[in-house]
Curated annotation (Swiss-Prot):
Subunit architecture: Homodimer.
SUPFAM superfamilies (alphabetical): alpha/beta knot
Family: Belongs to the RNA methyltransferase TrmD family.
This protein's record includes keyword DNA damage: no
Biological process (GO), any one: tRNA N1-guanine methylation
Protein name: tRNA (guanine-N(1)-)-methyltransferase
Location in the cell: Cytoplasm
GO molecular function: tRNA (guanine(37)-N1)-methyltransferase activity
Gene name in the database record: trmD
Cross-referenced InterPro entries: Alpha/beta_knot_MTases, tRNA_m1G_MeTrfase_C_sf, tRNA_m1G_MeTrfase_TrmD, tRNA_m1G_MTases_N, tRNA_MeTrfase_TRMD/TRM10
E.C. number: 2.1.1.228
Keyword terms, alphabetized: Cytoplasm, Methyltransferase, S-adenosyl-L-methionine, Transferase, tRNA processing
NCBIfam families (UniProt xref): PRK00026.1, trmD
Length: 250
């Protein structure tokens, strides 16, 4: 995969030279190029200007962005504009991007963009309902989430398939040595060596965590009959616990 990032602050992307993304570059699975679009601004070197019609703040000018992208050999690239008004980035979109050969990220750093920049763009994307100073942190997050899904980047394919959201559910609790730490012990089922019981426990824990923390994920989740039965059992247990607590508070 080839990724080009348009930014006024290339130095902010130093963390991408490490960990999984850095290793992917070393192994030739990934190429990342950073383009300071100020270098392509006209003689004034100004990349921003006041909005027509008045208003607060400055807008990113179209010319530096157009000229920078013209110099990138990426006619088939998917061009992503980091914008708070864009679609919310999620695991499904990361999976989608991981199948692309070329990506371009445009990071703004002002009040907004000249609307004409969007004529270059295939996707306007946001991390969520909040505003960042610039698009750099959002771009780093999206690059990291996307690159780790590229085949061969992570050793075992199941390493990311079991992640929260990859299956549609939140991930089950996990433990490592020691068995007992400060009186907190590993659930016995994980020590049993019984693979089927461990699978069922993990599935139940994933469903329970998702129901308690992100019930919205269950609305569009295609459940198996087994999962449906387990979820009903969990709901019944929660209702019983709530009833007991209410009675104790009387």
């Amino acid at each position: 995969m080839k990724i080009d990032i348009l930014t006024l602050f290339p130095e902010m992307f130093a963390p991408l030279e490490h960990s999984i993304v850095g290793k992917a570059k070393e192994r030739g699975l990934l190429e990342i190029n950073y383009h300071n679009f100020r270098e392509n601004a006209e003689k004034s070197r100004h990349v921003d200007d006041e909005p027509y019609g008045g208003g607060q703040g400055m807008l990113l000018r179209a010319q530096p962005i157009f000229d920078t992208i013209d110099k990138i050999d990426a006619q088939k690239a998917r061009v992503i504009l980091l914008d708070p008004a864009g679609r919310t980035f999620d695991q499904d979109f990361a999976e989608e991007l991981s199948k692309e050969d070329e990506l371009i990220f445009i990071c703004g750093h002002y009040e907004g963009y000249d609307e004409r920049i969007k004529s270059l763009v295939t996707d306007e994307v946001s991390l969520g309902d909040f505003v960042l100073t610039g698009g750099e942190l959002a771009a780093m997050t999206m690059v990291d989430a996307t690159v780790r899904l590229i085949p061969e980047v992570i050793g075992k394919e199941t390493s990311h398939q079991d992640d929260s959201f990859s299956s549609g559910l939140l991930e089950y609790p996990q433990y490592t040595r020691p068995y007992d730490y400060l009186g907190m012990t590993v659930p016995d089922v994980l020590m049993s060596g019984h693979h089927e019981n461990i699978r069922k426990w993990r599935l139940e824990q994933s469903l329970r965590k998702t129901l308690e923390r992100r019930p919205d994920l269950l609305e569009n989740y295609a459940m198996t009959d087994e999962e449906r039965l387990i979820l009903e059992k969990i709901k019944t247990e929660i209702e019983r616990t709530d009833t007991v607590n209410e009675q104790n508070n009387l």
